[in-house]
Amino acid sequence: MKQSEVKELSVAELQEELGKSRKAYSDLKMAHAVSPLENPIQLRTVRRDVARLATELTKREQQ
């Protein structure tokens, strides 16, 4: 998810997407621990999405 897409989301949507992304990251980590992922770069991509969403959510809560 791009930063421009993240900025367009409401706070409720940010929280929902953050939950989904954290779950996806957890699932990917578990799958990678059991057997190597075909595309391990997915881990980095999802982790960065989680960080992007969490940063935007924190920024909005402080305003």
From Swiss-Prot:
It holds the Pfam family Ribosomal_L29. One of its GO terms (molecular function) is structural constituent of ribosome. GO terms for cellular component: ribonucleoprotein complex; ribosome. It comes from the Bacteria. GO terms for biological process: translation. Keywords: Ribonucleoprotein, Ribosomal protein. SUPFAM superfamilies: Ribosomal protein L29 (L29p) (SSF46561). NCBIfam families: L29. This is Large ribosomal subunit protein uL29. It comes from Christiangramia forsetii (strain DSM 17595 / CGMCC 1.15422 / KT0803).
